[in-house]
A protein has these predicted regions:
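Active-site-flanking alpha-helical
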Residues: 29, 119-120, 157
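Terminal-tail/helix-coil boundary detector
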Residues: 155-164
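Structural helix-adjacent loops and short alpha-helical linkers that scaffold large soluble proteins
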Residues: 42, 83, 129-137
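Residue-level signal for nonpolar/aromatic packing positions in well-ordered secondary structure
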Residues: 5, 24, 95, 113, ...
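Alpha-helical packing segments of well-folded alpha/beta enzyme cores
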Residues: 84-91, 143
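Surface-exposed helix-capping loop/turn segments at secondary-structure junctions
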Residues: 34, 97-108, 151-156
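GST superfamily/GST-like fold recognition
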Residues: 56, 60-65, 104-129, 136, ...
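GST-like domain detector, emphasizing the conserved glutathione-binding G-site
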Residues: 1-82, 86, 96, 105
């Protein structure tokens, strides 16, 4: 299962293996005390938005990509594509509203942003910015730009070419 990690220095000094991006993000944030907020209220908000991505944004945007970019021409029934376009629009509006007056989804930069922003970026890969009304969501557009300007994000996106 990907993504997965093995932390040789897990809880109580024993190795631990984890899969699922949300579980990995939460584990690493709690272990390091970084990107998880400075109090229980912050942590609750960050966790809420992490779960929003895990249970809504990620699955729905993933299905949008499948039906809009990859399988759309092969499937005569237009209802799946329409459903995921509409759901992506709705979820994008939720993100945009949450970002009003904020730089990051839950206040300070956090694991919630690490989970959410890449799915917004995926709309470009899917060729679905226009159909989802991306340009009408100014807060989300500015948010993704801020995310992509972060040095760690740039480093992560600079993957080496695969050998031929």
């Amino acid at each position: 299962k990907i993504p997965a990690i093995i932390d040789p220095n897990g809880p109580d000094g024993a190795p631990i293996g984890l899969f699922e991006s949300g579980a990995i993000l939460l584990y690493l944030a709690e272990k390091t005390g970084k990107l998880i907020g400075s109090n229980n209220a912050d942590k609750a908000q960050i966790t809420q938005w992490l779960m929003f991505q895990m249970g809504g944004l990620g699955p729905m945007f993933g299905q949008l990509g499948f039906f809009y970019k990859f399988a759309g021409a092969e499937i005569e029934d237009t209802r799946p594509k329409e459903r995921y376009i509409n759901e992506a629009k709705r979820l994008l509006a939720v993100v945009d509203k949450q970002l009003e007056g904020k730089d990051w989804i839950a206040g300070d930069y956090s694991i919630a942003d690490i989970a959410i922003a890449p799915w917004l970026r995926a709309l470009d890969f899917y060729g679905a910015r226009e159909v989802t009304g991306w340009d009408n969501h100014k807060n989300a557009v500015a948010y993704l730009d801020r995310f992509l300007e972060r040095p760690a994000v740039q480093k992560g996106l600079a993957t080496p070419a695969r050998p031929a």
